[in-house]
Amino acid sequence: MSRKQLALFEPTLVVQALKEAVKKLNPQAQWRNPVMFIVWIGSLLTTCISIAMASGAMPGNALFSAAISGWLWVTVLFANFAEALAEGRSKAQANSLKGVKKTAFARKLREPKYGAAADKVPADQLRKGDIVLVEAGDIIPCDGEVIEGGASVDESAITGESAPVIRESGGDFASVTGGTRILSDWLVIECSVNPGETFLDRMIAMVEGAQRRKTPNEIALTILLIALTIVFLLATATLWPFSAWGGNAVSVTVLVALLVCLIPTTIGGLLSAIGVAGMSRMLGANVIATSGRAVEAAGDVDVLLLDKTGTITLGNRQASEFIPAQGVDEKTLADAAQLASLADETPEGRSIVILAKQRFNLRERDVQSLHATFVPFTAQSRMSGINIDNRMIRKGSVDAIRRHIEANGGHFPADVDQKVDQVARQGATPLVVVEGSRVLGVIALKDIVKGGIKERFAQLRKMGIKTVMITGDNRLTAAAIAAEAGVDDFLAEATPEAKLALIRQYQAEGRLVAMTGDGTNDAPALAQADVAVAMNSGTQAAKEAGNMVDLDSNPTKLIEVVHIGKQMLMTRGSLTTFSIANDVAKYFAIIPAAFAATYPQLNALNIMRLHSPDSAILSAVIFNALIIVFLIPLALKGVSYKPLTASAMLRRNLWIYGLGGLLVPFIGIKVIDLLLTVCGLV
């Protein structure tokens, strides 16, 4: 579920951004953007020249110089406005999160158990390791782990999802977030962070982006822009002595206008806005990124590790068939399977009970009335079952049942091995049922591959991204599902160690890897991955290890995260191409206007047939300022993204933004020149 989207030009945000744009005119703020700092210096210089001309201290056209100066200041203001608007949108999103934080009191327990004596303390004084009790109606005062109890929790303030979730001690659902509300029952929580370090605090800080650090690609692009600016600065500086030597020295105002039009002011003015907007778009997808670096890395990813359950398949495996062992009838197998599943509350367990009822009219029986003992599933045993009337019935994975039989002196039958392989080859998961040391047969659990997922993987393959399915299933089942889903590779019988080793293997090959995870056992792999999306419903360890948190806890979101990252990189590249390309038109406008008096041959370059030198220079400066405003929506929304190969994407963007960057300024400058002439302003 995504949060409510802000309008691109929300009136209140625009007003606030205009105020911030004026505040950013101070030198300290401008220094952070070297390209726009040069424009700021040029604005200041031409303003001083205009005042000097108006007072008679300097010869020259004071009105023309003032017009150039005014539009240079407008250029700086527009660049400031773009950045301030992007930051304002992020801060508006952060303000909605700040509303979640409430000054409250917490019941700090003196001992780590329910019913212990408690002291009432302000929530902001809780420290890591403190134990608190929260009951129905209470706001959870800190991030932490549930050490006792279970409760229904409303996390809508954080995730935007109205459906409550269950949080309980033990397992992967013990993590709670400060600012969420208990709806029923009670929890004893151990705080896992100190004040100011909660997940909500970090979310607000990341979204506001007040101290946003530049990403590596941003730094590299900034260095390129600085280099271009220095080259054009030196080139412009050498033109004055050439014109003076020709007997008609060009004014400093014209040289400043030439410099500002030649340096890449368009991308220089929009670069920060693109980065902030990328983070904001990620939040729009209900994903919190720890930094712009994480969003950027998502755009460079070329390997996706995807969990099978919930990402590739629907995740609700259902019993589809009872396959009895040799000498066992199907009803006997179904009866034993149903008994072993009576107290199994998993979707798989309930589906076994229902299938036995549908096939053989075996009515569901109550475990307590049977005076039976239920044996729950554990990660160590990997099986569950029931002890009833001296009968010991178990169901579980093939390996687990094989070990169980051999430990009891039995032998795993060869015909059942064949049936297990048959089920696995069909893409189903085999569960083996055993009574004592006698194997009764196999239950086939069928999961459904999500509709359209194969086409999405084909698109990712076009983009050069390799998809790898991660599953705990055996190799035969994994291979069948991988073929059906259309993934490039798979890791079967996956363990945390195997995931970590696979990530390191791909990284050693120079690839960037993205993955999702929610459990403590996923933390090492999440920490190793280049893009690690932790589920908000997961453990604290997983969230701390990842560099993104999906508030919807939807593993499929990883594909959308990659799309957003690629869109940000494409937006930056496209606007850089446009910015550099449109310098060509400005060159044809200003060079003839500035130097035709000294070198008449340069009139041949006036292909736009602009009205006069003054109108040509002023038109180019006005266009240079206005194009920043026209491109703000593109910088904030991102360029149109289509899953294409790298070469096809490059060709497409060169045609649209390269050719567009060449043609648009010719049209724009000519139109502005005509308007200035018609209005008698030049």
UniProtKB/Swiss-Prot annotation:
The chain crosses the membrane at residues 34-54, 62-82, 219-239, 254-274, 588-608, 616-636, 656-676. SUPFAM superfamilies: Calcium ATPase, transduction domain A, Calcium ATPase, transmembrane domain M, HAD-like, Metal cation-transporting ATPase, ATP-binding domain N. ATP binds at D344, E348, F377, T378, A379, Q380, S381, R382, M383, S384, K395. It is a multi-pass membrane protein. GO terms for cellular component: plasma membrane. Keywords: ATP-binding, Cell inner membrane, Cell membrane, Ion transport, Magnesium, Membrane, Metal-binding, Nucleotide-binding, Phosphoprotein, Potassium, Potassium transport, Translocase, Transmembrane, Transmembrane helix, Transport. It catalyses: K(+)(out) + ATP + H2O = K(+)(in) + ADP + phosphate + H(+). InterPro entries: ATPase_P-typ_cyto_dom_N, ATPase_P-typ_P_site, ATPase_P-typ_TM_dom_sf, ATPase_P-typ_transduc_dom_A_sf, HAD-like_sf, HAD_sf, P-type_ATPase_bsu_IA, P_typ_ATPase. It is found in: Cell inner membrane. Gene3D superfamilies: Calcium-transporting ATPase, cytoplasmic domain N (3.40.1110.10), Calcium-transporting ATPase, cytoplasmic transduction domain A (2.70.150.10), HAD superfamily/HAD-like (3.40.50.1000). GO terms for molecular function: ATP binding; ATP hydrolysis activity; magnesium ion binding; P-type potassium transmembrane transporter activity. It holds the Pfam family Hydrolase. Mg(2+) binds at D518, D522. The active site is at D307 (4-aspartylphosphate intermediate). Its EC number is 7.2.2.6. Belongs to the cation transport ATPase (P-type) (TC 3.A.3) family. Type IA subfamily. The system is composed of three essential subunits: KdpA, KdpB and KdpC. Part of the high-affinity ATP-driven potassium transport (or Kdp) system, which catalyzes the hydrolysis of ATP coupled with the electrogenic transport of potassium into the cytoplasm. This subunit is responsible for energy coupling to the transport system and for the release of the potassium ions to the cytoplasm. This is Potassium-transporting ATPase ATP-binding subunit. The gene is kdpB.
